[in-house]
Amino acid sequence: MDLYPKNDQSQLKNIFNEAASINVNGINVSVEELANFEKMHHKIFKGIKFQVGANITSKYENGQIWTHVWAWWSGEGKKSKETATIPVHLAFNWDGLKCNNAFFMFDPTFINKEVALNDK
């Protein structure tokens, strides 16, 4: 999470196993698609910050280990010049040292508006 604001996606291949299921707001993506999504953020936003409020890993009764991250994403649209801070929830299910299931949840409205400006 420290590398994302620096536009460094090198950690993604180390975090996820080859069969990982990654879900971003209801859309299943590959590790490569997630990396491209992160790179796109840096093309259309500046001053990106990812401030973690809580990072908790728990082992549940069924034996599964999950890490939950609650954070705030913030940035300024390069075209709109608007800024926003968006609450984010990330959930990672671990199989040993690799993630095999992940969910990224946030309100995409601000990001989608900036994407639309850049598609014109």
Question: What positions do the PLM features span?
Answer:
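Small-molecule pocket liners
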Residues: 1, 20, 90
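Short alpha-helical linear motifs
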Residues: 36-41, 93, 109-112
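Low-complexity, intrinsically disordered terminal/linker segments enriched in charged
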Residues: 101-120
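Short, aromatic-enriched amphipathic alpha-helices that serve as compact interaction elements
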Residues: 1-7
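Exposed beta-sheet edge and beta->alpha loop/turn motif
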Residues: 70-106
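A solvent-exposed, acidic/Ser-Thr-rich amphipathic alpha-helical stretch
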Residues: 9-59
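A short, glycine/Asx- and small/polar-enriched loop/turn
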Residues: 61-67
